[in-house]
Amino acid sequence: MKNKCLLVLLLALGCCHVQAQKSQKDPLSEALVRLNQKVDSELIPGIKRFPLIGISTDISPKRTAVNTAYVQSVILSGGIPYMIPVTDNVEILRQIVSRLDGIVFTGGEDIQPMYYGDLPYEKLEEVSPARDTFDLMVLKMAADRNIPILGICRGLQLMNVAFGGTLYQDLPTQHPSIVNHRQKESGTTPTHPISIIKESKLAEITGQEVLQVNTFHHQAIRKLAPGFKITAWAPDSIAEAIEAYPIRQMIGVQFHPEIFTAAGDTTMHKLFKFLVNKADTFNLAKKIHSRILSIDTHTDTPLWFKNGYSVGLRKDNMVSIPKMEEGKLDAQFLAAFIWQGKRDDASSQKAVESTTRLIQSIYDEVEQYKDFCGIALTEEDLIRLKREGKKAFFIGIENGYAIGKDLKNIAKYKQMGVNYITLCHSYDNDICHSSTHTEDATEGLTRFGREVVKEMNRLGIMIDVSHASEGTFWDVIKYSTQPIIASHSSSKALCDHDRNLTDEQLRALAKNGGVAQLCLLDAYINKNPKAASVCDAAEHLDHMIKVAGIDHVGIGTDFDGGGGMEGGKGDNDLIYLTIKRIEQGYPE
């Protein structure tokens, strides 16, 4: 009976507690509860990748702001808009830009004429020095990283100025015409047509050769910046669009597509979708580089140390830690290069001494920036340095002349951390015949050269056949018991140069287990060196991969030693080649 009464009491208390809970007022309103439920129901992580699109902002004493249409256009196109605050703090901007996958440079005030070498004209209107500084800083950082860019109105003018072009400061007085470039109608009302160049990226994007646009500007391009082309014109010959594709991922329009896009225009919307798609590819390229180990197998940077160059500073040289970071490059081979000199005993000994000093200079240089980089001797060193957030520097020797007359020097170089030796340079030496200035390109290794190959195999130093004659190449294939490399050579099938490798050589190198590294030297890439670009280099890379296989092809730029071309002028540009591989459908 007692237990039964206790059970009834507990049930009664429970009912009272439930009634009390129901009568207690919920601290959250029904509207807020519904909103929270909506957020929870749609939080499904990892389903889709949304690229982060920076939007340049304007500044006033009370606020930093941007027109809502820019934000809406990015969201409608599948991007995440990020409004970049106006500041001249380089480190803050660097960290912001390094996270972005694409950028929209927006409309706004006139650009100060001093940035394009002109004096203020009487009709110059409002300028914003703070915004000019901010925009130009962000644009440089974005361009250095090969980030896809869309410039709108002022944004187009900004790109032109940043790369060396000039502007009309006031169209009505400096380029009078019947076209009114400052319409009074609403932004969704087109007021004049533009003619689009048929082969342009803009024509490809919009699918149009004539487009009706709005217009809200009194300045315009006067002289076009190098590296760009005008791809659309107004009826009065004012440039309405420019682009730097395929070398740089930049396109600019003088009209305002964001207004049309936010209002539902599907043609203008394509511009933003194009940017977001490019940004998505760029985002994927960065993620791939975060997972893989990327190495440039040949540079001649140590030659510049004596001139005050430093790997820690972003200067004119092509190789530096900041540029490696911008291009997402993990490691660099620094070659101790020695010119071919006389082959007598005294001259050969001087070559050994010079090479030793160059190698030591590499250690000295890296020591100065040990918080940011380190010497790597092995793959494990590279993996460790990447985990530590540091860049890795391997050491090579270019020209076996550095060995002198004594095989013992090879062991000395091994102890100093040398990972490969290029057997020769542009002239024959005691080891082998060169591909360039040679008595006979069919000749190969000398007797001493065969001993060098044997000793390098024994010590675990890679044999580099770049610069070697075909005869030397085939001799090394024959006598080497280990895989060999060509640290900086391109495809002879695409550019018939004595420094490049035939398809037969590429296949033999792959069969040997070795690797051929694409060289970014213009004369090796295009029969017309002045016309060479990173696009040509991408074709060489694609061909070499198809012939030798992807596991047997790499990159050895020859930066700071003759390498470089339009669109490939430093470590920061190397991510372009990854982007091209993605666009060509290569697997991750």
For each feature predicted by the language model, list its residue ranges.
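Glycine-enriched alpha-helix->loop->beta-strand junction motifs that scaffold or abut catalytic
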Residues: 247, 328-329, 418-420, 459-461, ...
